[in-house]
């Protein structure tokens, strides 16, 4: 029996997404800005629509919640475009918020992958 083939592009994009979940990275405006496309926008789990600069400002003020993610699935939609979906649980003290998440990553003309769109949907 052979191991399933891995796609290095999909693996790379999943690793970038996981970086964005790291609390140390999330508090580093420059690190997050490097991972987000200038045209980034998000439909947040809370229902808030976030644009690039507003999200960068908000992450600097974020609480000390932990985010655990699993169930990652990545699909190459076109050359230079990847859809990533997964489940997350955000925990702060005794409160857990579950979400279904999707992100669209695009490869820029400089060859770097950046998140263009993200959506968080509340989950049971």
Question: Which residues does each PLM region occupy?
Answer:
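A beta-strand edge to alpha-helix "cap/lid" segment located at domain peripheries
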Residues: 2-34, 39-124
């Amino acid at each position: 029996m052979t191991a399933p083939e891995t796609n290095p592009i999909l693996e790379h994009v999943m690793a970038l997404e996981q970086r964005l979940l790291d609390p140390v990275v999330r508090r580093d405006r420059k690190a997050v800005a490097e991972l987000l496309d200038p045209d980034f926008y998000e439909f947040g789990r809370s229902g808030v629509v976030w644009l690039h600069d507003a999200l960068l400002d908000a992450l600097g003020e974020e609480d000390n919640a932990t985010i655990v993610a699993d169930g990652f699935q990545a699909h190459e939609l076109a050359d230079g475009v990847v859809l990533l979906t997964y489940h997350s649980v955000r925990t702060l003290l005794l409160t857990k918020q579950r979400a279904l998440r999707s992100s669209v990553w695009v490869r820029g003309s400089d060859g770097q992958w950046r998140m263009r769109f993200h959506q968080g949907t509340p989950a049971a």
